[in-house]
Amino acid sequence: MADIKKSSLELIGGTPLLEAARYSKKAGVEKATILAKLEYLNPAGSVKDRIALAMIEDAEKSGKLKQGATIIEPTSGNTGIGLAAVATAKGYKAILTLPDTMSVERRNLLKAYGAELVLTEGAKGMKGAIAKAEELNQEIEGSVILGQFTNPANPAIHKATTGPEIWKQTDGKVDIFVAGVGTGGTITGVGEYLKEQNPNVKVVAVEPAGSPVLSKGTPGAHKIQGIGAGFVPDVLNTKVYDEIITIENEDAFAEGRAFATSEGILVGISSGAALKAATILANRPENEGKVIVALLPDSGDRYLSTALFNTQN
């Protein structure tokens, strides 16, 4: 009876690392090891639970967020779900602005946690959602924008939790870390921590081929929800990664499906992108015998209406 959690917030973090042997075999990987960090096992279903709790608690400690206040956040989905869940658990109201291109499942999840949604024009991307959030912040007294793209608590929580978890789980035997870049918090925090432990760890950023902002400075439309915000976020440490791999929409979809049908685990579109990058790295001759950790941000059940799984339409 001693190991009983008192709050859903205590369940955030500590996600498992899976050796994706069946997926690797299906992907033709023979000479490197791919490990998948399964972030969908956080209580609200994604890696963003970590930053939702961290940003809210940071705002509470600084006095910026007071009891009964409204939390406003521009989000492409998962941060909003995490914030809606944490806000509910802590007694805050949440208003979330997001592009109308986000999946129906994500919108319904946000509503299910009690959040109010304000949809913005999809073509304007996250910039449109950010502008709307700032407008609402001016209108609603006592409201707070936590600002995942600019908030130092975002990368800090990954440096404090996700990075150390990976290091401990691999017993320090991680050679390459692969992560998609949305806000840049995950790759910044984890990358900095791993490189502090071992400067030889290679950190690889993944971005959509349709919006290669980091590699070519060119924003554009793409279908890999959760990464490729269309600009370089303030919290992203652009010196932490050693390489950028761009992934096509269809490759992200294909690898997400391949993981589901090999490992029996549904993962999201950005997870498919990270897996594709991991297989590219694993099949390079110079990476023979190396351990590659790919961070898989969320579950595929958030994308059943998208081209990831809805292949009949």
Residue ranges of predicted features:
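PLP-dependent amino-acid enzyme catalytic core
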Residues: 1-313
